[in-house]
């Protein structure tokens, strides 16, 4: 049997909102398997649906860039929020985002690329920046979207300056490349930033995630004591709601609260082919520090 630690119980409680004793029991029943423990709590009606993202604590910036029918986005991490306001760091993120337009999404290829205006690579420039600023930094990930005929749009939420912020979205829309489509692309970016969908269409939903969800929903429905035929209908309705939560094209358009995203896109005579959403530090664990400690750490180099 796995050793159930206090940290595991705390983590499960943060993920589900369930009570401490319930979380401990769930971990004991599932031999310490965190994912199975979440499902166990949900089946018992002791937890809300699993949260879609991990704890976010890392600092740095998300940067976007455009050129013609392509748009790119990168995430560059640092240790403290102070660095995000550093001009040299901002310039580095902007440059790497622009490089991704031609180099592509592969982070190793990006690091090996020549840094514009210098006689060394992006990786070497990053080493130099680390030495100057005094903090560890890393290029975590990159994404590029491209269209044949249409608009590659982007949206940055809470931008410190144009193209730099903590949440970034890329959107690929095929259609007539005009101002109206560009506006729609930005609106979809805002929608994605707010609703955090996991998939573009129902066909893109991870089959294993869907099966897990169905199993949980069926168990919840059976707890009602209703006949199996009624339970099947209940599960169908809840699966539809699941799709509306996680599938972009099935979601309700945040800008009017009524239409489906798919209808909005179709009405514009366009096709939404891809979206990418980066949240700074998504899924990265970082030891919590108070503001005074962060100031002291920054001052001490």
From Swiss-Prot:
Cross-referenced InterPro entries: EF-Ts_dimer_sf, Transl_elong_EFTs/EF1B, Transl_elong_EFTs/EF1B_dimer, Transl_elong_Ts_CS, UBA-like_sf
Record-level GO cellular component terms: cytoplasm
Primary site of residence: cytoplasm
A Pfam family the protein falls into: EF_TS
Annotated spans, Involved in Mg(2+) ion dislocation from EF-Tu: 80-83
Cystine residue pairs: none
Family note: Belongs to the EF-Ts family.
Record localization: Cytoplasm
UniProt organism field: Acidiphilium cryptum (strain JF-5)
Record key words, sorted: Cytoplasm, Elongation factor, Protein biosynthesis
Protein name according to UniProt: Elongation factor Ts
GO molecular function: translation elongation factor activity
Protein purpose: Associates with the EF-Tu.GDP complex and induces the exchange of GDP to GTP. It remains bound to the aminoacyl-tRNA.EF-Tu.GTP complex up to the GTP hydrolysis stage on the ribosome.
């Amino acid at each position: 049997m796995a050793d159930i630690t206090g940290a595991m119980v705390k983590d499960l409680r943060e993920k589900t909102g369930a009570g401490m004793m319930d979380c401990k029991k769930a971990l004991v029943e599932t031999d310490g398997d965190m994912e199975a423990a979440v499902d166990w709590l949900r089946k018992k009606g002791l937890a809300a649906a699993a949260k879609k993202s991990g704890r976010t604590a890392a600092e740095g910036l998300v940067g976007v860039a455009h050129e013609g029918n392509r748009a790119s986005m990168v995430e560059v991490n640092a240790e403290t929020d102070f660095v995000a306001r550093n001009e040299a760091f901002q310039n580095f993120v902007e440059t790497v985002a622009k490089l991704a337009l031609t180099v592509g999404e592969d982070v190793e290829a990006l690091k090996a690329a020549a840094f514009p205006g210098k006689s060394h690579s992006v990786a070497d420039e990053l080493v130099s920046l680390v030495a100057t600023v005094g903090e560890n930094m890393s290029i975590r990930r990159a994404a590029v979207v491209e269209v044949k005929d249409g608009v590659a749009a982007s949206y940055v939420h809470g931008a410190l300056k144009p193209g730099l912020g903590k949440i970034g979205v890329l959107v690929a829309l095929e259609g007539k490349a005009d101002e109206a489509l560009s506006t729609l692309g930005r609106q979809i970016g805002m929608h994605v930033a707010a609703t955090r969908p996991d998939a573009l269409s129902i066909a893109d939903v991870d089959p294993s995630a869907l099966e897990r969800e169905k199993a949980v929903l069926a168990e919840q429905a059976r707890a009602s004591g209703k006949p199996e035929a009624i339970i099947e209908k209940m599960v169908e309705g809840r699966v539809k709601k699941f799709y509306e939560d996680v599938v972009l094209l099935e979601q309700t358009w945040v800008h009017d609260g009524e239409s489906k995203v798919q209808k909005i896109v179709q009405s514009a005579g366009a096709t939404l082919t891809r979206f990418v959403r980066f949240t700074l530090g998504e899924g990265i664990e970082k030891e919590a520090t108070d503001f005074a400690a962060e100031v002291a750490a920054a001052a001490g180099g």
